[in-house]
Regions:
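N-terminal targeting signals for export/organelle localization
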Residues: 1-46
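Thiol/disulfide oxidoreductase modules built on the thioredoxin-like
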Residues: 3-4, 111-116, 123-133
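Short gly/ser/thr-rich secondary-structure transition/capping motifs
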Residues: 25-27, 46-52, 119-123
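A short beta-strand-turn-helix
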Residues: 43-65, 70
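Conserved redox-active cysteine motifs that mediate thiol-disulfide chemistry
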Residues: 68-85
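Short alpha-helix adjacent to the SAM-binding motif of class I
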Residues: 85, 104-112
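Thiol-based oxidoreductase modules, predominantly thioredoxin-like and allied folds used
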Residues: 92-105, 115-126
Length: 133
């Protein structure tokens, strides 16, 4: 019986310390974005599947949503239906940043699942999307 008292006591002490630590921890931690209040980054990128380029200058004065996605990204597949619904509603134009992907794979993905974007740019090296946070 005595051989269980010490380990049991240590375990109980650890549970109490953990419980007190959880109770004293802040409930919500918000890390402010360094990009808030700053102008949107400028970019000029090739349009996916085209020889044309697209510049952020053409977006000036209007609201748009920028979505960074890739065919290799499981979360992108999950959110894709929601993006299609947003596009169908016409509430907000969507600009797609295809990030670090192969053009053929990205075009096939959009053909298969639908294209919610008014324009899709190919951010092949991934540098432009990083500027957007």
């Amino acid at each position: 019986m005595n051989r269980f008292l010490l380990p049991g006591g240590v375990f109980l002490l650890l549970v109490i310390v953990l419980f007190i630590g959880i109770q004293r921890a802040p409930q919500k931690t918000v890390i402010p974005s360094a990009l808030l209040g700053k102008p949107a980054p400028q970019f000029t990128l090739p349009v996916l599947g085209s020889n044309e380029s697209f510049s952020s200058a053409s977006l000036a004065g209007r609201w748009h949503a920028i979505n960074v996605w890739g065919t290799w990204c499981p979360e992108c597949r999950v959110e894709h239906d929601m993006l299609l619904r947003i596009a169908d509603s016409g509430a907000l134009p969507l600009i797609g940043f295809n990030w670090k992907d192969q053009d053929e794979a990205a075009l096939g993905w959009l053909d298969q699942l639908g294209n919610p974007y008014s324009v899709v740019v190919a951010d092949r090296d991934g540098r432009e999307a990083i500027d957007w946070g």
